[in-house]
């Protein structure tokens, strides 16, 4: 009976003094948003850390088509830019063409007299950057020769023809006099003259066309002079021809004079191309051109420029993200993610931010969970949430502003004789890409570290703000929660949340409850001790009763005990 009584009293004591379920106390926990499956990002201190949300910074795919807006994109179709400039018959449609970006197709071909350009890449780049094929004919006087030479290799319609921007000069009768022609530049812009020299396949062809056994072409300005002698000899047959034409070009500055001297083999200019300075360019691509809007174009197609980096192609035109080697770089746009644990303990799923985050928060990144005499509830804290969001919102735009190129990255081309220059250029470009790739990774890691630190700081600010409000009216439970030692209904909780809580109103009640509870408070860890003590006392009392019964029986003679030594 005594044992039973003691156990009942101890059990009643434990449950009656539990402050968590009391009507005169409340529990308030502070926490932050969490998701079941976060995103891994890299920071300065951690190679992988989970956050609630992140934004991809690397554009790794294109639209597959080239947008024709806001840039003027000219589709070269089956013509190269140089063929269009020379006036190849099948490229007549491009005469006087204008563009911001000229698209050369892999299917482009020449369909006139076979030619070569010793400095092809430079001429191609020069014309491409000019953005126009605007041509002005000039009245060159070629006395004593036959003009407008034609070839069966260059058909315009059903008739033999030639490059429309060049004039093939041959003998007149049985003579080819020495030609001396000058053409001043009296305008205020640069003029580009295209000319050439014919290399016959045989000596017989040479004398048949130009009389002399070997011709010569000299083109001069005040700044330069080029003298070219034909190389007579057979070459591989192209469109029925084993001869060749070499194309050269000369820029005449304002106030300068173009001088042409030749005694044979001259492919003369018919006029000049007006040179313009600008940011026009050329790109090799087989992507289709479509009606759409994009400020960044690559050979793979247009790409959005709303990300700071791209991994689509090194060659770009327009306002484009920086090319980097990484296929993915994630910028943290949320806080550190600590998924919510399973429901446990007498306080259910409610636990503070030190233990875990809270899933399912829809009204903020930070908030409160509480349990009082009216039940349980949850509410977000908009002020701390907005403070964190404001600092993160402009982060992506700042990164884009630091990295977007406001110019185009054109293709670099070199002739075979410039192999060492090409190798050096490739090394420089690869080094720049390596450097930018490293800088990009470092920049993102720094920004991610800052984001996580500032979101952690906002959580700590909210906790300290709450602590300062409650003062001695509550106790920090060590897990992000406060045990409030006075009756705190929903209106009281709301005053804590919005910062209007007056601790003086509840101070006396809190102190009184704290002293009463502290006298008998049993935390969950001491309940086991009470049970063990109860068990030990019960065993002791049973032993005492049993020993007393034995001694009483011995005195009455009902039990005899013999002790032998």
Curated annotation (Swiss-Prot):
**Superkingdom, natural source:** Viruses
GO biological process terms, alphabetically, are: clathrin-dependent endocytosis of virus by host cell; fusion of virus membrane with host endosome membrane; fusion of virus membrane with host plasma membrane; viral budding from plasma membrane; virion attachment to host cell
Signal peptide start and end residues:
1-16
Q: How is it modified after translation?
A: Palmitoylated.
Arranged from A to Z, the UniProt key words for this protein are: Clathrin- and caveolin-independent endocytosis of virus by host, Clathrin-mediated endocytosis of virus by host, Disulfide bond, Fusion of virus membrane with host endosomal membrane, Fusion of virus membrane with host membrane, Glycoprotein, Hemagglutinin, Host cell membrane, Host membrane, Host-virus interaction, Lipoprotein, Membrane, Palmitate, Signal, Transmembrane, Transmembrane helix, Viral attachment to host cell, Viral envelope protein, Viral penetration into host cytoplasm, Virion, Virus endocytosis by host, Virus entry into host cell
Is Hydrolase among the key words of this record?
Answer: no
UniProt GO cellular component terms = host cell plasma membrane; membrane; viral envelope; virion membrane
Q: Which Pfam families match?
A: Hemagglutinin
Q: Does the keyword Membrane apply?
A: yes
Indicate the transmembrane segments per the record: 530-550
The glycosylation sites are: 37, 53, 78, 180, 300, 498
Provide the primary localization.
virion
Site described as Cleavage, located at 344-345
Here the disulfide bonds are 29-481, 67-292, 79-91, 112-154, 296-320, 488-492
SUBUNIT field: Homotrimer of disulfide-linked HA1-HA2.
**More about this protein:** Major glycoprotein, comprises over 80% of the envelope proteins present in virus particle. The extent of infection into host organism is determined by HA. Influenza viruses bud from the apical surface of polarized epithelial cells (e.g. bronchial epithelial cells) into lumen of lungs and are therefore usually pneumotropic. The reason is that HA is cleaved by tryptase clara which is restricted to lungs. However, HAs of H5 and H7 pantropic avian viruses subtypes can be cleaved by furin and subtilisin-type enzymes, allowing the virus to grow in other organs than lungs.
Name of this chain's protein:
Hemagglutinin
Q: To which species is this protein native? A: Influenza A virus (strain A/Equine/Uruguay/1/1963 H3N8)
The organism's lineage is:
Viruses, Riboviria, Orthornavirae, Negarnaviricota, Polyploviricotina
- Report the gene name: HA
């Amino acid at each position: 009976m005594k044992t039973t009584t003691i156990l009942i009293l101890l059990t009643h004591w434990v449950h009656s003094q539990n402050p968590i379920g009391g009507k005169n106390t409340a529990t308030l926990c502070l926490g932050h948003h969490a998701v079941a499956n976060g995103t891994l990002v890299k920071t300065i201190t951690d190679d992988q850390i989970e956050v609630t949300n992140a934004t991809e910074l690397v554009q790794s795919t294109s639209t597959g088509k080239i947008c024709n807006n806001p840039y003027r994109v000219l589709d070269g179709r089956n013509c190269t830019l140089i063929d269009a400039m020379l006036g190849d018959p099948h490229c007549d449609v491009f005469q006087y063409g204008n563009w911001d970006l000229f698209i050369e197709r892999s299917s482009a071909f020449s369909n006139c007299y076979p030619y070569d350009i010793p400095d092809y890449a430079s001429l191609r780049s020069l014309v491409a950057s000019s953005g126009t094929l605007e041509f002005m004919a000039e009245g060159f006087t070629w006395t004593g020769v036959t003009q407008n030479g034609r070839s069966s290799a260059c058909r315009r319609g059903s008739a033999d023809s030639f490059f429309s921007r060049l004039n093939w000069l041959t003998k007149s009768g049985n003579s080819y006099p020495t030609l001396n022609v000058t053409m001043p530049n009296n305008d205020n812009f640069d003029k580009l003259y295209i000319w050439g020299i014919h290399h016959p396949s045989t000596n017989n062809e040479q004398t048949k066309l130009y009389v002399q056994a070997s011709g010569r072409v000299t083109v001069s300005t005040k700044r330069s002079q080029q003298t070219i002698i034909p190389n007579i000899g057979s070459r591989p047959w192209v469109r029925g021809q084993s001869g060749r034409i070499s194309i050269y070009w000369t820029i005449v500055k304002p106030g300068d004079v173009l001088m042409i001297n030749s005694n044979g083999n001259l492919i003369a200019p018919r006029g000049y191309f007006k040179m313009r300075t600008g940011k026009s360019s050329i790109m090799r691509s087989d992507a289709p051109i479509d009606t759409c809007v994009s400020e960044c174009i690559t050979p793979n197609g247009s790409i959005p420029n709303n990300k700071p980096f791209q991994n689509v192609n090194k060659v770009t035109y327009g306002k484009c993200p920086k090319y980097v080697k990484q296929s993915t770089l994630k910028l943290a746009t949320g806080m550190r993610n600590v998924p919510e644990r399973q429901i446990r303990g007498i306080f259910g799923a409610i636990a503070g931010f030190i233990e875990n985050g809270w899933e399912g928060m829809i009204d903020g990144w930070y908030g409160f969970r509480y349990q009082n005499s009216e039940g349980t509830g949850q509410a977000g804290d908009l002020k701390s949430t907005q403070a964190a969001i404001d600092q993160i919102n402009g982060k992506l735009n700042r990164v884009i502003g630091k990295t977007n190129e406001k110019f185009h990255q054109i293709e670099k081309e070199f002739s075979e004789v410039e192999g060492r220059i090409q190798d050096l250029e490739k090394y420089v470009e690869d080094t720049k890409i390596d450097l930018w790739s490293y800088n990009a990774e470092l920049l993102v890691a720094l920004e991610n570290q800052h984001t996580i630190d500032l979101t952690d700081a906002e959580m700590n600010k909210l906790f300290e703000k709450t602590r300062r409000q409650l003062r001695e009216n509550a106790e920090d439970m060590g897990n992000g929660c406060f045990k409030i030692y006075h009756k705190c209904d929903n209106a009281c909780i709301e005053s804590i949340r919005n910062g209007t809580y007056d601790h003086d109103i509840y101070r006396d009640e809190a102190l009184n409850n704290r002293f009463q509870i502290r006298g008998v408070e049993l935390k969950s860890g001491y309940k086991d001790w009470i049970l063990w003590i109860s068990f030990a006392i019960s065993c002791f009392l049973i032993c005492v009763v049993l020993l007393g019964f034995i001694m009483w029986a011995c005195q009455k003679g009902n039990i005899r005990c013999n002790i032998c030594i």
